[in-house]
Every structure is written in structure tokens, then in C-alpha cells.
Amino acid sequence: MIGLVGRKVGMTRIFNEDGVSVPVTVIEIEANRVTQVKTLENDGYTAVQVTTGSKKANRVTKPEAGHFVKAGVEAGRGLWEFRTEGEEFTLGQEINVDIFADVKKVDVTGTSKGKGFQGGVKRWNFRTQDATHGNSLSHRVLGSIGQNQTPGRVFKGKKMAGHLGAERVTVQSLEVVRVDAERKLLLVKGSVPGAINGNVIVKPAVKA
């Protein structure tokens, strides 16, 4: 079963049958339109490419426009690809949120909020150094980042200050609380990566 591309609407809460408040993220999943079907013979692997939403005509490049026209679908806000195994798809086919009707848990992938350049305390949860007792300059600095003559360098991958966020993040095994096919909404328990209105990819959970 493939996944779908949606839009993070925001968070709210609903009450279950026992009256317990459940925090949920609302994901709007409009119909995903098939723009290309990749086959083993032509592409070396099997996959389906989809788009969703819409894009202003003056924002669509000529190569994109030709691609959408060939598929016979309206220009969407992006292109995403899902590997397939035995499933049959046709150009222009629409795939809706109701494919998750019988799914218990999903994996959600999004782009995390960008935080810019951050220090080691915020980025890697380093502990701070002493606030007093003679420390006047090094409260939030990293401390030692290597040794001396041996090895005489800083190892690659050392946790240091740098750019935080704005990267692809996947949260696994989120419980599907509700599928509202009429309003094209999927409610999952807990939070998902990214800002409001950000694109998210929803797939059946790998570890479910």
C-alpha cells in the first residue's frame, strides 16, 4: 500500500468514548493525482508519482507544465513518488484519504521547523557549565572538543554548534484516531514534524 501527501492543518483535541482528552494533529489530504507510473522495464523499478493541491499557472515551469499535461491532470504544488509492489495505477487516477480507513498506525514525514544557527545546549542538549565559582565566560560553550597531540584533530561528526532544524524528519507509529473522507481529513494522535501548512507524507506504519 502506498502513502499519500497531505497538509498539516494544526493540532486540537478530541474526546474518546471514555471521556479522555486525546491530542491530535489534523492533516488535510486532498485527492492525490497520479502523474507518472514507473515500471521495471522502463525505469528499473516500480513506483507511482503523484501530485496534490494546485499551483498558480505563472508559477509552473514549462517542463512541469508538459509533465502535467501528459498525465492529464491539473498542476499541483509538487511531485512525490512512492515505491509500489504489484499495485496497478493509471495516469490521472485519484487516490483519496479513505485508503487509511482500515489502517491502525501510520508513519508521518515532514520538514522540521528551521531554528537557524544554534549552540550545543539547544541543538544537542549539552549541559551548561558552572554559572559561578570562577566561570565568567564559558557558561554555554561546548568544553573540550578533542584531545591533544593524539589524535591532533577533531573527529568528524563531533556534536557542535550549527544549523538546527529544516530537515526531513519521520515520526513512526502514530495512532490513526479518525478518518473523515467527506472533509478529506486524517486525525492522528500526537504531533507531526513541521510548521502549519507544511507538506507531510503519510504512510502505513512500518513497525505496526
Swiss-Prot record:
Keyword field contains RNA-binding: yes
Q: Any idea which UniProt keywords this protein has?
A: Methylation, Ribonucleoprotein, Ribosomal protein, RNA-binding, rRNA-binding
Q: List, in alphabetical order, the Gene Ontology terms for molecular function in this entry.
A: rRNA binding; structural constituent of ribosome
N5-methylglutamine PTM positions: 149
Query: Pfam families recorded for this chain?
Result: Ribosomal_L3 (PF00297)
What does the entry report about post-translational modification of this chain?
Methylated by PrmB.
Q: Any one cellular component term from GO for this entry?
A: cytosolic large ribosomal subunit
Note the SS bond partners: none
Q: Which InterPro entries match?
A: Ribosomal_uL3, Ribosomal_uL3_bac/org-type, Ribosomal_uL3_CS, Transl_B-barrel_sf
Q: Name one GO biological process term.
A: translation
User: How does this protein assemble?
Assistant: Part of the 50S ribosomal subunit. Forms a cluster with proteins L14 and L19.
Tell me its family. Answer: Belongs to the universal ribosomal protein uL3 family.
What biological function has been recorded for the protein in this entry? Answer: One of the primary rRNA binding proteins, it binds directly near the 3'-end of the 23S rRNA, where it nucleates assembly of the 50S subunit.
UniProt-recorded name of the protein: Large ribosomal subunit protein uL3
Source organism per UniProt: Haemophilus influenzae (strain PittGG)
